[in-house]
Regions:
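Non-catalytic, topology-defining segments of multipass membrane proteins
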Residues: 1-61, 66-68, 72, 76-175, ...
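Transmembrane alpha-helical segments that form the membrane-embedded catalytic/substrate-channel core
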Residues: 41-56, 85-89, 180-206
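Short, surface-exposed loop/turn motifs that are enriched in glycine and acidic residues
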Residues: 173, 177-181, 189, 217, ...
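Short, motif-level signal for alpha-helix interfacial/capping segments enriched in acidic residues
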Residues: 28-37, 174-177, 203-219
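Histidine-centered catalytic micro-motifs
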Residues: 50-59, 89-101, 193-200, 223-239
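Hydrophobic alpha-helical segments, principally membrane-spanning helices and signal/leader peptides
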Residues: 28, 40, 70-71, 182, ...
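Active-site/pore-lining binding-face segments in mid-to-C-terminal subdomains
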Residues: 196-267
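Alpha-helix capping/termination and helix-coil
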Residues: 161, 165-172, 183-191, 195-202, ...
Length: 328
């Protein structure tokens, strides 16, 4: 994980000095170019990579429990500069999403939406932007987990309180340094989750092989710590990021038997974009035919179209599955 440590130092060296300069009373001919460079590097250069590093370290913290305070550096110190409010990511992703597996109790579930619909994606994104924290808190109340509820509320509240206070000194700098990264991060996280869980087998939505997708052979995986291997990540959330390609190669028949969708030469943004265009020919051309599981391109297109249809609520949750297993 040393590459992640080096990456952290690079972010500190780039963004902390630039943020300080943006809060200084620089002349406009210096401030505006600096703001543009900061925003470009943040949004297009490093934000996604930071979020996915935060993802890795949320699952596998760098430091042992006795040094846990050092694990707070990424979410509490560096995170706000990269669009992440403290504790919210961990609470949502570790404390909710992986436990609920995109089923009905998952606050970010894609099940009930038509996943090639621009209107449905807009509803999904806006709902998360404006009500995500409230629904997450309600989820933790329902599950009687006050610690994570309180952490997420405190982290998000302190982020906005800090932004308000800093706005009194320089609202333009606060907008560039904290608010724009925050908004764009929330949007891209929802875009990513939408793509990762777009093709759900309605007959078995609790099956990780049938509710998530994997993308391979794209530079996204080299830049973003193999985040494209989303199926294996749900099957084994604690699997080290370097081991995901091996998991796929060693379990090709399992993927084929479960009808798992693996795409190559495209990343999640491309999946989302082509879904919004309803370009199933393009999407199907990127699907990997593992062990000859498909007979034709037309069969792949038919499967893709079937698996983006909305799934009506029937009370399918991880709790209901566990209860059914106990009865059985």
């Amino acid at each position: 994980d040393l590459v992640l440590v080096y990456f952290t130092f690079r972010l500190i060296a780039i963004f902390i000095p630039m943020a300080i300069l943006l809060y200084l009373a620089l002349p406009l001919y210096l401030w505006i170019p600096l703001a543009i460079v900061y925003s470009y590097l943040n949004v297009f250069g490093y934000k996604s990579r930071f979020t996915l590093m935060l993802h890795i370290t949320s699952h596998r913290p760098w430091f042992k429990s006795e040094y846990n305070y050092l694990n707070k550096f990424l979410p509490w110190i560096l995170g706000p500069f990269m669009g992440q409010s403290p504790e919210a990511y961990f609470a949502h992703h570790i404390g909710m999403h992986h436990l609920e597996g995109n089923l009905e109790d998952d606050d970010s579930t894609t099940m009930h939406y038509k996943r090639d619909s621009k209107a449905d994606f807009s509803k999904y994104m806006l709902s998360f932007l404006f009500f995500g924290l409230f629904r997450l808190a309600a989820y933790f109340n329902k599950k009687n987990r006050p610690e994570l509820r309180n952490k997420s509320i405190i982290g998000e509240s302190l982020f906005f309180i800090g932004a308000i206070v800093l706005s009194y000194f320089n609202w333009q700098a606060t907008l560039v340094v904290f608010i724009l990264p925050f908004i764009t991060t929330r949007i891209t996280m929802m875009l990513g989750n939408w793509a990762q869980h777009s093709f759900i087998d309605a007959s078995d939505p609790a099956n990780e092989y049938k509710s998530a997708i994997t993308v391979i052979n794209h530079r996204f995986n080299q830049r973003c710590w193999n985040d494209g291997y989303h199926i294996s990540h749900h099957v084994k959330p604690s699997l080290h990021w370097t081991n995901h390609p091996a998991h796929l190669l060693e379990n090709k028949q399992v993927y084929a038997d479960n009808g798992a969708l693996v795409f190559e030469g495209i990343e999640f943004g491309g999946i989302w974009y082509n879904l919004m265009k309803k370009d199933y020919d393009k999407l199907a051309s990127h699907v990997v035919n593992i062990n000859g599981m498909y007979n034709s391109l037309e069969e792949i297109i038919a499967i893709l179209k079937e698996r983006i249809k909305p799934i009506a609520p029937v009370g399918l949750t991880m709790d209901s599955i566990r209860a059914a297993k106990k009865v059985a």
